[in-house]
From Swiss-Prot:
Name assigned to this protein: Putative inorganic phosphate transporter C8E4.01c
Protein family membership: Belongs to the major facilitator superfamily. Sugar transporter (TC 2.A.1.1) family.
Residues spanning the signal sequence: none
Biological process according to GO: monoatomic anion transport; phosphate ion transmembrane transport
Amino acid sequence: MAFGSKILNIGSKSDEYNDDAVPLDQVEEGAQERRYYLGLTKREFKLMMLAGVGFFLDSYDLFIINLVTPIFEYLYWGGIEKGPTGKGHYPSGIRGLVNASANIGNIFGQLLFGFMGDFFGRKFVYGKEMVIVIIATVLVIAMPKSIHSPLSKMMWVFCWRWLLGVGIGGDYPMSAAITSERSKIKRRGTLISLIFAFQGFGTLAGAIVTIILLGCFEHPLNREGHYHKLEGVWRLQFGLALVPAIGVLIPRLIMKESKSYENSKALNSAEGKDPKAFFNTDDEDNMKKSSSHGDSEVVEASDRYANQADAADAEVDNIEKQFAAVTTPENSSGFITYFRQWRHFKHLLGTSVCWFLLDIAFYGVNLNQSVILKNIGFSTGTNEYRTLMKNAIGNLIIAVAGYVPGYWFNVFLVEILGRKWIQLQGFVITGLMFAILAGRWNEISTGGRFACFVIAQLFSNFGPNSTTFIYPAEVFPARVRGTAHGVSAALGKCGAILASLLFNFLTGVIGYGNVMWIFCGCMWGGILFTLLLPETKGRDADEIDRLELFYGKDGKVQCDSKWKSWYFNGIF
């Protein structure tokens, strides 16, 4: 056949096991590696730690502000009930802005790093986000004592936590793409979920660190009433995040490029072009024969290639490889061209809107959990120290009982139940908990409201909080994965910002019960947009992408009956 000698094995996962081009089915079924930790191979374990520690740090940095907020109130605004002059307190607008600062930065980081990851490559980008996180953290805790105005102090924190958010945001699309491209398809969901589950440990660590620090300062705070010592507490709360950040910096900077990404770049130039233009007449005839399963021409081809188990598939594979070899990357136009088609855009719409609706409720609760605990009567004490300690203990209980277990339910069940079912049931049950809180806010006891929040956290993290991260990593092909994941996550952070800025205002205007109705509506709205998404369990987005280029619209779908179902393929 009239082809060049260079062969590119597009979409193969072989780069994670050896340097030779190995067919995907051989990698999936034939590569046997011993499993050690949590059922993972050594390579999977290293990947989990490298990306997972990043998510531990992300969660710690994002949600520690919830535990620092009461300290800011006592230290700079004279307490919760009244300010230094007896006429005010920590303004809800300023509090919301400071709480939202990292999430605002997230949007820029997710879009910027997602695009750069697709355009320049994963290696070029990965690790740079951690440099930003380290610099921003140092600047936050270096707030000079020469700043006297409480408002100026909060603006200092806001500015550098915004920069911190840029770095954290960049970690989302890059870690998701790298994990997806270096995982076996049958274990991909579990590994991505496992890495994302480190967020639970980050939130848990924030509560534990706060309790330990308050315990260390117990004598000057509780017995002597020297509350200016809280200055050291909040700086340590923020500053301890430097430990994991520095630990993963070098390994990220020296990580090699994913061959799955390198190979996928060639497909961008194929979008919208006729593959036949790259082959001669004989090649064109062979491709037609290979795409006609079951007819007489395939039988003739099988006779000519007696030494091959399936001549048609071998011919298609050969043509796909050669076609990739003669193409060149055009990453800048690939994203727009790909999502110009509704069958692709509906997936981006589903992942983005589901993430947006989830984060309105998720961050509305988590960034204001200390305020909610005080309102339901849990975090009250005889003095400031005891109030802060009870608040930290309340956050710890919610993390242990609902937050962390939810992630691990997802880890163990994501490959059994599938992504779509888990996301649907999570939206339903979390919405139900918010409905109960909304309808009976004033009637339910403190323990009852606390239990509802724990259950909501459990099913939120088991369901949509995990699957909204998994979906963009699996449903989009590698050539647009980083940008698409960044867009989805950025829209989610828009929801988080809305919740951060408006929660305190709305609770003062319409009350906590009506705010819970808003959260309930967001959860049940997520059910509708989940229906746009396919089930990605066992789905190879890169393979489907290649087959669509060769066989036209829904080429893969027509060859596999299970994708004909609305449930597996999504509505519309």
